[in-house]
Amino acid sequence: MIDFRPFYQQIATSPLSAWLETLPLQLKQWEKQTHGDYAKWAKMLDHLPSLPCEVNLADKVEARLVEPLSAGETQRLVHHLKQLMPWRKGPYHLYGVHIDCEWRSDFKWDRVLPHLSPLKDRLILDVGCGSGYHMWRMVGEGAKMVVGIDPTELFLCQFEAVRKLLNNDRRANLIPLGIEQMQPLQAFDTVFSMGVLYHRKSPLDHLAQLKNQLVKGGELVLETLVIDGDINDVLVPADRYAKMKNVYFIPSVPALINWLEKVGFKNVRCVDEAVTTSEEQRKTDWLENETLVDFLDPQDHSKTIEGYPAPKRAVIIATN
């Protein structure tokens, strides 16, 4: 099983120390309720090699071995990593193996990065972090510590697999909880929430929860689905959106800015809008599930298969 004690030691003398009042008990309870496959995934981590390597997090997530693996060793590594499929967010380049994930998350990072306050020496929270691709890119920008939260057990095991192949780097940590389970720490310099808001039944509550994790003057980076329209326009899908059952509210950019200001954020601005393309989200050898092309109207890719506007994402920056 995955040991969280090193993380407790890390935060004991940090601005996150108050989290130790609740977190250890929460994670003990979490371990009792884990998915049936979790033990199998966690045990697989023991089979991964940990070899001397050069780590590059500056422009990708890469671990280059001093001495390359043999063909047989590479085949075994691929076999172990594919036990953790589907790999959704990446890509990763590890020990000569290219994990070509469903999402080219580097595309999103390239859109977001130019607009951020410098991440160097910052304490960062990444909400809904998935397997942690963007967390490693934040570390590459010089963050002091990045904490990701995501309750999905597979993502935790994928993250720990990548960490092991990155020289067991402790500057990033994934905690398998949701934002609603976190006490208000008001301790993070930057909080990211990317690809989460539209899954929330109460989006304003989610924005308030993000605000409660930021220091005064801290920065929120919010990325979410949007539609065209004015301050009054919000899409509430009748049933599914792009075959997703758990999509509740997709606002226009002006409506989203209004929500953020309503919960108390300042200096709210939209810095990027991008339609999701099949270059950014597509099927690969590391994903057997359906992907973007399966979610769109086959006759008109400007619409989802249900007839709604096709996915478009906006990046919003705001100050606490």
UniProtKB/Swiss-Prot annotation:
Keyword Hydrolase recorded: no
EC number: 2.5.1.-
Gene3D superfamilies reported in the protein's UniProt record: Vaccinia Virus protein VP39
Region forming the signal peptide: none
UniProt keywords, alphabetically: Transferase, tRNA processing
GO annotation, biological process: tRNA wobble uridine modification
GO molecular function, one term: transferase activity, transferring alkyl or aryl (other than methyl) groups
Enzymatic class: transferase
Taxonomic superkingdom: Bacteria
SUPFAM superfamilies referenced in this protein's UniProt entry, alphabetically: S-adenosyl-L-methionine-dependent methyltransferases (SSF53335)
Subunit: Homotetramer.
Role description: Catalyzes carboxymethyl transfer from carboxy-S-adenosyl-L-methionine (Cx-SAM) to 5-hydroxyuridine (ho5U) to form 5-carboxymethoxyuridine (cmo5U) at position 34 in tRNAs.
Family (UniProt): Belongs to the class I-like SAM-binding methyltransferase superfamily. CmoB family.
Name used for this protein in its record: tRNA U34 carboxymethyltransferase
Provenance organism: Glaesserella parasuis serovar 5 (strain SH0165)
Gene: cmoB
